[in-house]
Swiss-Prot record:
Cited Pfam families: HTH_WhiA (PF02650), LAGLIDADG_WhiA (PF14527)
Keywords noted in UniProt: Cell cycle, Cell division, DNA-binding
Gene3D superfamilies (alphabetical): Homing endonucleases (3.10.28.10)
Function in brief: Involved in cell division and chromosome segregation.
Matches recorded under HAMAP family: HTH_type_WhiA (MF_01420)
Gene Ontology biological process terms, A to Z: cell division; regulation of sporulation
Entry keyword Cell division: yes
Gene Ontology terms, MF aspect: DNA binding
Domain of life: Bacteria
Protein name: Probable cell division protein WhiA
Length: 320
């Protein structure tokens, strides 16, 4: 099995998480699977939902999730597509015309007030939490992701249906601390990453922790290999100390959440949640992942105030 297929297979077997995260991934796969179009039939316009994938496991995940999450029947079909390289087997998830409009509205792909297609990703996903953002990227990669072989120059690309969707995906990547670029190849709009460390982090955040080790471990650049696996190798003393400090910070933040419950200002809660979601991020990377972005000093200050608040609450409780 090719490494790209292994990545998509691993992502397809991840527990979908909360309904909000599953919805984010379903919506992303419908967009990047290019399965949404309007068709004029007689006197009415029908919505056809039939995304196609090169991975049968990805298509099967989408079929099962549409049926379980939205209670809408979906059929899995194989389709032979003619390409310049010859015939290619694809896998389509067919929702059918009757349920297509309902699914499009519920996933935010169409504005029911204007009966108009939303060209970029829906706003509720762009403004969603970190878990939803990861779900969007996971769905995009499962649908239209390309990954270079380990012996080739590092590259990860997402083939996008339009400019607006590419812009939305890039903005979401920034919230994960990932900087991606947009470019066009033969009229195809793509979101592109070339930094091997960024690719390794993104694949890990999407959930491909096993296959990303294969991708990184087979790279001929030994220095890049060790850098990309800094948390697993612990050969360098500075890296070991940084990883230990980050792990301790996660434990302290989680304890503060348990102590304070709902009595936490939103800005302090958001900073603490960023540390829990990204235990291997530097303070600068956490600041870039915040929305809106903040400085590393602001992140450090908010986490410090959160811990101080929890410590004071424990002291007050002990004296009561």
């Amino acid at each position: 099995m090719a490494l790209l297929d292994e990545v998509k297979s691993e992502l397809s077997n991840i527990d979908g998480g909360s309904p909000a995260v599953q919805k984010a991934q379903v919506t992303s796969m419908l967009y990047f699977g290019r399965g949404f179009r309007k068709v004029q039939r007689e006197s009415s316009t029908q919505i056809i939902v039939q995304p196609q994938f090169d991975s049968m496991e990805a298509a099967h995940w989408l079929q099962e999730t549409i049926e379980s999450l939205y209670k809408i029947p979906a059929a899995l079909k194989s389709v032979d597509v003619k390409t310049p390289q010859g015939s290619m087997r694809r896998y389509a998830v067919d929702v059918g015309a009757r349920a297509g409009f309902a699914l499009a509205v519920r996933t935010g792909m169409i504005d029911p007030r204007l009966n108009r297609i939303v060209r970029g990703l829906p706003t509720d996903l762009s403004n969603g939490n970190i878990a939803q953002i990861k779900g969007v990227w996971r769905g995009a990669f499962m649908s239209a992701g390309v990954l270079s072989d380990p012996d080739k120059p590092s590259a990860l690309e997402i083939i996008c249906p339009n400019e607006e969707t590419a812009d939305s995906l890039i903005a979401m990547g920034q919230r994960l601390g990932i900087r991606a670029a947009k470019h066009t190849v033969r009229s195809s709009v793509r979101v592109h990453l070339s930094d091997p460390d960024a690719i390794e982090r993104l694949l890990t955040m999407m959930g491909a922790s096993s296959t990303v080790r294969d991708w990184t471990g087979k790279r001929p650049d030994t220095e890049s290999h060790h850098r990309a696996n800094r948390l697993a190798n612990f050969d360098d003393a500075n890296m070991r100390r940084s990883a230990k400090a980050a792990a301790e910070a996660v434990v302290k933040v989680q304890h503060a959440f348990d102590v304070l419950g709902d009595d936490i200002p939103q800005n302090l809660r958001a900073a603490g949640q960023l540390r829990i979601d990204h235990p291997d991020f530097s303070l600068e990377e956490l600041g870039r992942a915040a929305r809106p972005q903040i400085s590393k000093d602001a992140v450090a200050g908010r986490i410090r105030r959160l811990l101080q608040r929890a410590e004071k609450a424990e002291q007050d409780a002990a004296m009561a």
